[in-house]
Amino acid sequence: MFNSIRNFLGFNEPEEYEEYYEGEIDNNDYHALYPAEMPTPLPEESAPAPRRLPENPTVASNFAMNSNTTPTRNNVIGLPGVSNSPAEVVVCEPHSFEEMPQIIQALRDRRSIVLNLNMMDPDEAQRAVDFVAGGTFAIDGHQERIGDSIFLFTPNCVQVTNSLSREETPATPAAPARPAAPAPAWSDEMTPMAQAQ
């Protein structure tokens, strides 16, 4: 049984060997079969050709001009997806799940999203949060719940911190007073009967 599975998977393929002749090979035969390669001479070093400045004025501006040195090219290249423009926060209040792909695209464009789901059905809102959270996870972004059905989703270039400490947090309305617990049916003092034992 095991062999039939191995045969089916191709592990018991009959090995085919090339036929070879045993015998002494003298050195003349070896050199006849494998002639020695002649080493190729190295090209003689020549002086490098002088650099020529481009004739396009916009490209020429990328070259540094200095009277004491030869022209050199400015090799600084900007990172794709990173710009010097200010960060953008998009506030979205979707009415249906069909609007979620646009929110994911905004995250991919490195924009932060404040997602207010108060206008959606609760089941559809949960599905929307799960979808956007998955997209945020896929781009190594961050998510934070900032209110009732309000979420913040940011790309990985934005760090979200809560700068308020517990002492600085504004006082929230006090919870309704709970009724006092009834007095226990037994007292904390030991009864004379318990002391006798």
From Swiss-Prot:
Homodimer. Interacts with FtsZ. It is found in: Cytoplasm. Residues 38-72, 164-197 are annotated as: Disordered. The keyword Cell division applies. Transmembrane segments: none annotated. Residues 170-185 have a biased composition (Low complexity). This is Cell division protein SepF. It comes from Picosynechococcus sp. (strain ATCC 27264 / PCC 7002 / PR-6). GO terms for cellular component: cytoplasm. Keywords: Cell cycle, Cell division, Cytoplasm, Septation. Residues 58-72 have a biased composition (Polar residues). Its main location: cytoplasm. The gene is sepF. Cell division protein that is part of the divisome complex and is recruited early to the Z-ring. Probably stimulates Z-ring formation, perhaps through the cross-linking of FtsZ protofilaments. Its function overlaps with FtsA. Pfam families: SepF. Belongs to the SepF family. PANTHER family: CELL DIVISION PROTEIN SEPF. GO terms for biological process: division septum assembly; FtsZ-dependent cytokinesis.
